[in-house]
Amino acid sequence: MKNALLNLSLLTSSVWSPISGGITAPDGFLAAGISAGLKPSGKKDLALLYAPDGACCSGTFTQSVTRAYCVDLCIDRIKASEGKIRAVVINSGHANACTGSRGKIDSEMITHKLAQLLRLSSEEVLICSTGVIGEAIPVEKVNSHLDQLINSLDKEAYLDAANAILTTDLQVKQIAYQAVLGGRRISIGGMAKGSGMIHPSMATMLSYLTCDVGVDHVLWSDMIKRVAESSFNSITVDGDTSTNDTFLAFASGAELDPRYLSILEEGLHLTAQHLAKSIARDGEGANCLLEIKVEGASSDLDARAIARTIASSSLVKTAVHGSDPNWGRIIAALGRAGTSFNLNDVKLWIGPYEIFSNGTPLDFDRQIVSNFMKARLTGKYLIDDLISIRLRIGIGTGSATAWGCDLSDQYVRINADYTT
């Protein structure tokens, strides 16, 4: 497991700067991550995020009809409490999806026990689960370790928590940013997990943001929906949507001058996009981060549909893995995205190289482009491992970016052996 910070120097803005501290960088949050014996490996598998003074919570969730009960519990409790949530417990190794009535009972037993220990109401506690579908949570193991989990709560335990939520991930996914707004230092933290079964619809895998700003629940919910669209809903690894996809965001602190809310949202987008790209790059068996940029579409919605269609194309992804500048596969994916455009207006670049223009391929050196791709496939994680594909499809104002990864034979091996 690689715990190094992820190329923070490349992710800056005019206002927001990367800092250490992960999910607990903002004031008002503590975290913990321990081993409760849920994983045969003995690795950390139980995490807790806690806001002692309370927080405003909003989230987006999987649209799967076969979603796990923990997703319904989160949705119901956020709605019933108008976002007043103080804790979320996360177990890895057991998805607790498709486990019948037991899934509901187990989720409620764990949150009830945790609420008692923290002296909260059950409605203030959420639960998220990740792991093998059909496997129930070992409730006795979890509940017998809740005291240890609570005693491990600490401002410095952000890496413990980020490790405890992982399953097949090879990389820890955590980040924090800070800005000074109106003379006040504001921090945003995040952590996530995800490596396979990633093609979210309204959410993604398990992802968490924290912020030390007080925000109205309705306003916060609107922000988080927009953040999800520009980040977690813009990535794909394998085209599969999980039963447990959850993105939760917590805000706790003094209210911010409304003049700075747009800058706050910029920071939320920045943080979520870093986590989203980390997930896409850590796709099972992946060797590079694939970025699809679409410009000139009639709307952002059309551009997003095109970008995600190309990013999720198995033929495009395998061509990238083979360092093959096969523009035909990209154009074919463009054509089935369900949007209108004139092929004679289309221009295509792989990295800095223009490959296709005004409806016809250009005379380019395939070996040079292939070597460019090959170098990125052996690049350092989230530093020089980006292969960018850019399309201009017209003169419209619509644009969007999606992220994915190459598709290798290792992905097949990992998933063929997943439960065996």
From Swiss-Prot:
Organism domain of life: Bacteria
Q: Which UniProt keywords apply?
A: Acyltransferase, Amino-acid biosynthesis, Arginine biosynthesis, Autocatalytic cleavage, Cytoplasm, Multifunctional enzyme, Transferase
User: What is the organism of origin for this protein?
Assistant: Prochlorococcus marinus (strain NATL2A)
Uppermost EC category: transferase
What is the purpose of this protein?
Catalyzes two activities which are involved in the cyclic version of arginine biosynthesis: the synthesis of N-acetylglutamate from glutamate and acetyl-CoA as the acetyl donor, and of ornithine by transacetylation between N(2)-acetylornithine and glutamate.
Record text on subunit structure and interactions: Heterotetramer of two alpha and two beta chains.
| InterPro entries in the record | Arg_biosynth_ArgJ (IPR002813), ArgJ-like_dom_sf (IPR016117), ArgJ_beta_C (IPR042195)
Reactions performed catalytically:
N(2)-acetyl-L-ornithine + L-glutamate = N-acetyl-L-glutamate + L-ornithine; L-glutamate + acetyl-CoA = N-acetyl-L-glutamate + CoA + H(+)
Family annotation (Gene3D superfamilies): ArgJ beta chain, C-terminal domain, L-amino peptidase D-ALA esterase/amidase
The record's Pfam families line, in alphabetical order, gives: ArgJ
Q: Where is the active site?
A: T204
- From the UniProt record, report the name of the gene that encodes this protein: argJ
Quote the subcellular location field of this record: Cytoplasm
GO annotations of cellular component type:
cytoplasm
Enumerate the Gene Ontology biological process terms: L-arginine biosynthetic process; ornithine biosynthetic process
Site positions per UniProt: Involved in the stabilization of negative charge on the oxyanion by the formation of the oxyanion hole: T130, G131
Q: Could you identify this protein by its name?
A: Arginine biosynthesis bifunctional protein ArgJ
The record's family statement is: Belongs to the ArgJ family.
A GO MF label: glutamate N-acetyltransferase activity
